[in-house]
Design a protein with these regions (language model features):
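Mid-domain catalytic core of redox enzymes
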Residues: 1-58, 65-72, 76, 88-89, ...
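Flavin (FAD/FMN) cofactor-binding core of flavoprotein oxidoreductases
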Residues: 67-68, 79-127
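Hydrophobic, well-ordered secondary-structure elements that form the walls
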Residues: 11, 40, 60, 86, ...
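Active-site-proximal substrate-binding core of FAD-dependent oxidoreductases
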Residues: 101-103, 159-185
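A generic alpha-helix signature
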Residues: 73, 77-81, 146
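Short FAD-binding loop at a beta-strand-to-alpha-helix junction that anchors the flavin cofactor
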Residues: 57-59, 123-142, 147-150
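Internal hydrophobic alpha-helix adjacent to the cofactor/substrate pocket in enzyme cavities
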Residues: 147-165
């Protein structure tokens, strides 16, 4: 499954060093802005307790298909670019108290033409192997909420199967029977 690289730059600031009110979830950066940053989540505004009292936590997503290769930039370069791009919009002053950089070379699945059919074929192949399931952002939606919904449907299906006949995927393994194994252990 093709995927674009992504870097996440998290920055902690004193609340007094951020002039923007940060009331909301964050912001997205349009393609026309020509920035490495795709968007910024205002973590401390969105989630209680995410940052100590008197501080804010900002999480910038950098790279994606818009800026391939960003995940390979040095952590210092990524943090400096993200900070420089956020500063005019959020009114950042001074240096962050702390910064973290996480890089994933294959983070965002790219749903190309034929994706639904490709996933259908993959799931049909997986169905021939009891207990093997495909779930996650590569299959049913790149948003975290889509991954949770798909996992919930999968778990519900397994719970229903197990309740209905007492033989979910773990029952097959407990019996020592594997598909295409030829009867041996």
């Amino acid at each position: 499954m093709p995927a674009a690289g992504l870097a996440v730059v998290a920055l902690a600031y004193r609340a007094t060093d951020v002039t923007h009110a940060l009331q909301g979830y964050g912001h997205l950066v349009t393609r026309g802005e020509k920035q490495l940053t795709l968007g910024v989540v205002w973590e401390s505004s969105l989630f209680d307790g995410r940052a100590p009292e008197g501080t804010v936590l900002l999480r910038a997503m950098v790279g994606g298909v818009r800026n391939p290769g960003c995940a390979e930039l040095s952590p210092d370069t990524l943090a400096e670019r993200a900070t420089a791009e956020m500063t005019p919009l959020l009114g950042l002053r001074g240096e962050p108290l702390r910064r973290w950089v996480f890089r994933w070379p294959a983070a965002i699945p790219q749903y190309e033409r034929g994706h639904i059919e490709r996933v259908r074929r993959m799931r049909a192949a997986a169905a021939r192997h009891p207990g093997l399931e495909l779930c996650g952002t590569s299959y049913d939606g790149i948003a975290f909420s889509a991954a949770i919904a798909a996992a919930d449907r999968l778990a519900s299906r397994h719970a229903t199967d197990a309740a209905g006949n007492g033989a979910g995927p773990s029952a097959t393994l407990a019996a020592g029977s594997f598909a295409n194994e030829g009867g041996g252990r």
